Every structure is written in structure tokens, then in C-alpha cells.
Amino acid sequence: EVVIEHGALLRIPGILQNYDSHRPFIIADKNTYSVAGKQICSLLDKKGIEYSSFVFPQEDLEPDEFSVGQVVMNFDSNCDFVIGVGTGTINDISKMVAKVAGLKYMIVGTAPSMDGFASSTSSMILNKVKISLPSACPVAIVADIDILCNAPKKLLQAGFGDLLAKYISICEWRISNLITGEYYCEEVA
């Protein structure tokens, strides 16, 4: 389920109901909590939906084993759903937590800074090495246009760059196929 519209946060209680969730666990950082997390918590309070949350206290968040551990150490085992509030790093951490917990997962995007919202992998740092790990694929992606439009300029630029890189990487893949015989799949490209 993908919801991209003005006021999209208002749809979150209905999405939770569609997936029979009665107590979500919300993951955010200080910035994404102030941009959208606080509104989500207020909305859930008004609807009488119980939830638990963890807001990362640090400024420079990395998608590593320490960050996943912080969430796990604060995770409420009574929760039946995971809501990530943020973009790249929060998305990757939340997907990993949802996979480990065996729960459904929703991402609430706060900036169009990357294109991995629907991915079933997480870009993680393990022992200081960047790797891709299988993770939970979101059952819902929620993007409030008003929030996305007010994202910092550098995050808007990052998203544009991410989109451009996809086209360039496909061209490089084709060239590699022609020159070296590298496997190429038209369907994936």
C-alpha cells in the first residue's frame, strides 16, 4: 500500500487497522520525530491506539549493529507492528528490527532523499563495513507531500542524485555486458 498525498499521516490509523495492528512500535530520530513522529503519536493518542516508541538521542545516526541494538534493547514485546519515521538510515534500521521481530512494517518518509523505501534489503554497517542484508519489505509506504516539500534542500538534492544514479548504473551495466559479457537482465534493468 502506497499513500502519497497531502495529509497522508491521517491515513496511518486506517492502515494499522487494515493489518490488524493494535499496538505499533514507532522508530524515529530527533529530527524525524519533530517533523512527523510527534504528529503520528498525537494522532494515535486521539484515536485511542496504544503504541510504544524509541527516538534515537544521537545526532549522527549510523545503520549499524549499535543502532539496531539500541532499538532492540528498548523494544516493547507487546507491539505487533513497526513504524519507521524517516528516510534512509531509519528505514534500514526499522526494516531490520521488523525482520528480526517477525512483524509487519510501515515506513513514513520524511524526505525524498533516496529510493529504497520499498526495498527488501537494508544497507547496514557491520564491523565498520557497509553491507546489504535481507530485511522486511514494508507493507505500507506513507509520504505526506507537505512534509516532503519542507525537507532540507540537501535531502531533496540527494534524492534527485539517487534517481539519476539509477539510469547511469543501468547504462554502465549494459556497457559491461557488451565489453566483458557481464550478465544483464532487461527485466531487472
Give the location of each predicted region.
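A short, small-residue-rich loop immediately preceding and capping a beta-strand
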Residues: 75-111
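ATP/NTP phosphate-donor binding region
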Residues: 1-81, 157-165, 171
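Residues that form or flank phosphate/diphosphate-binding pockets in enzymes
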Residues: 35-36, 92, 151
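Short, conserved acidic/polar surface loops in the N-terminal third of protein domains
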Residues: 63-67, 93-96, 117-119
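Short beta-strand/turn micro-motifs composed of small residues
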Residues: 27-28, 86, 143
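A glycine/threonine-rich phosphate-anchoring loop and its flanking beta-alpha core
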Residues: 101-189
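Short, electropositive, low-hydrophobicity segments enriched in small/polar residues
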Residues: 9, 90-92, 113, 120
